[in-house]
Design a protein with these regions (language model features):
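Mid-domain catalytic core of redox enzymes
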Residues: 10-19, 252-367
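A glycine-rich dinucleotide-binding beta-alpha-beta segment and adjacent secondary-structure elements
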Residues: 187-196, 412-471
């Protein structure tokens, strides 16, 4: 097996072909139509959801993915020994059940189950929780000594937040209003959300309130069966609804004419369309695929000010066949040796805080009964981008060793119990997704307004990706895909008296 130097190897062995060298390479666009109603660029959850809704409504939809499989960051890789690792299957709110039922199918919805053992361990406190409003209310009143009235007001305030609220209050100010001087409570409330979407105490409070309240509704959920099963079922649903899905198809240009979007260039081939939904990075959509010359000067200025969110590192650990991890270890473990919650410490290359995701056999009940652990940390692109190969490999090995050191507290003698370990860095995320700076959470809050205003700049151009923190994560991505697909349907059906009946029914 050969792999790209410095990167986590992909799950496709690169084998010398037995075909004659004069064979033509496969045409991944063979059989495509010359024109579609909609081209969706990128098959992350937002892209796939948009494509599925529009295909179900009867529109001609072409879904283009540059990678060799669908899913975006909702992905996985396999290793010998029946090991399958999920990249980002680490918990989402209950709302995912409702969204999948309405916009996908019951086969997907029925596999969503709750994680009931969310564990915190740091110098300030150590506890286990079901991570919902009822349990957090008990914790805040009994263990942290906050009055029930204050807790109720805090939860009600967070739950009542929406995009149209005052955006000047920061998350830090929100916490100080209800829990002044309580860094331990800030840590309890903020640390998991920072891991979930890269948000900080300096971001607008509404970005925290909306995401936190989604989780507090009924807790943390996961897809039982693994990301590979989820994406396989989504791909089958896309096919059922007439979506033309193509992998290994890299869009280099979105074509713009006097009246708006007119097509895309993919693998060197021009395909016409009436609308484009980009599920790619917002900045690369604007500045690379379209080009700044097609936008108003003020819009370009605003787009240039959009900050990318941080990246991530992960360490994947497969246990030996005979090893079992007690379920009392937890499903998600937020552990830290840092004395207090600090965003910069969560990003620092000298890692003090990690999330361990424990995968028990029930995660993939139909596969071999194997245990696995994935460690995730937030990371800065700058700490990895400019390392030479020797430095890069040494830094990856250090990441692995320090992760095993941290795991030892929770899984004693872990090195003897693990048969395979690999690491991914911001460079890995960049390599496989093409996200600028390896961003694993899209953009900061200001990216949402820029993303939403694309159709006002260029008729037929839309974006449905991870932006503004609110639209990050599995649920945020799916819901943004829903919002954008409805707008595209309305645009396509403007000459009709009403939107497509299938969309209207949703």
């Amino acid at each position: 097996v050969f792999h790209i130097a410095g990167e986590t190897p992909c799950d496709e062995p690169l084998i010398l072909s037995s075909r004659p060298i004069f064979d033509m390479p496969k045409d991944f666009l063979a059989g495509t139509l010359p024109e579609y109603d909609v081209v969706v660029i990128g098959s992350g959850l937002a892209g796939m959801t948009s494509a599925n809704i529009l295909g179900r409504a009867g529109h001609r939809v072409l879904l283009l993915e540059q990678h060799y499989k669908l899913g975006g960051l909702a992905t996985w890789f396999k290793r010998p020994g029946s090991h399958t690792f999920d990249i980002s299957l680490h918990g989402f709110p209950y709302g995912m059940i409702k969204s999948c039922k309405r916009y996908w199918n019951d086969a997907i919805t029925s596999n969503i189950v709750q994680l009931k053992n969310i564990r915190f361990d740091n110098p300030m406190f150590s506890l286990m929780t079901t991570y919902n409003r009822e349990d957090f209310t008990k914790l805040l009143t009994s263990q942290f000594g906050v009055s029930e009235e204050t807790v109720v007001r805090f939860f009600d305030t967070a739950r009542g937040m929406n995009f149209y609220d005052d955006q000047s209050m920061t998350t830090r100010e929100l916490f100080e209003k209800f829990f002044p001087g309580r860094e331990d409570i800030v840590r309890l409330l903020m640390e998991p959300i920072t891991y979930a979407n890269g948000s900080t105490l300096e971001d607008p409070a509404i970005t925290y309130g909306i995401v936190f309240s989604n989780f507090m509704a009924k807790g943390v959920f996961i897809y039982e069966g693994g990301t590979d099963d989820l994406v396989t079922k989504m791909q089958a649903e896309l096919t059922k609804n007439g979506v033309d899905t193509r992998i290994r198809c890299d869009v280099s240009k979105i074509l713009v004419g006097p009246k708006g979007v007119r097509g895309v260039v993919v693998n060197g081939k021009e395909i016409r369309c009436k609308a484009v939904i980009s599920n790619s990075n917002l900045r690369s959509t604007i500045f690379q695929m379209v080009g700044p010359e097609h936008f108003d000067a003020k819009f370009v200025e605003d787009a240039q000010e959009v900050r990318l969110n941080n990246s991530s590192t992960q360490v994947y650990m497969a246990m030996k066949p005979e090893v079992e991890i007690p379920e009392s270890t937890g499903d998600l473990l937020f552990c830290s040796t840092a004395p207090a919650f600090r965003t910069d410490l969560l990003l620092d290359r000298n890692i003090t805080s990690r999330t361990f995701s424990f995968y028990y056999p029930r995660t993939r009940p139909h596969g071999k009964q194997r245990h696995a652990i994935v460690s995730s940390t937030n990371a800065n692109w700058s700490d990895w981008a400019d390392l030479n190969e020797e430095e890069y490999e040494a830094s990856k090995q250090d990441l692995i060793e320090t992760t095993l050191d941290a795991l030892e507290k929770y899984v004693p003698n872990c090195r003897d119990k693990i048969e395979l370990v690999e690491a991914a860095t911001p460079r890995t995320f960049h390599h496989y997704t093409k996200h600028l700076a390896g961003a694993s959470f899209g953009t900061k809050f200001e990216g949402l307004a820029v993303s939403r205003s694309l159709p006002q700049q260029i008729h037929g151009l839309y974006h449905a990706g991870s932006v503004g923190i609110i639209m990050s994560g599995w649920l945020g991505a799916i819901n943004y895909g829903v919002i954008v697909s409805n707008e595209v349907d309305q645009m396509l059906c403007r000459s009709m008296s009403s939107p497509s009946p299938a969309i209207q029914a949703q």
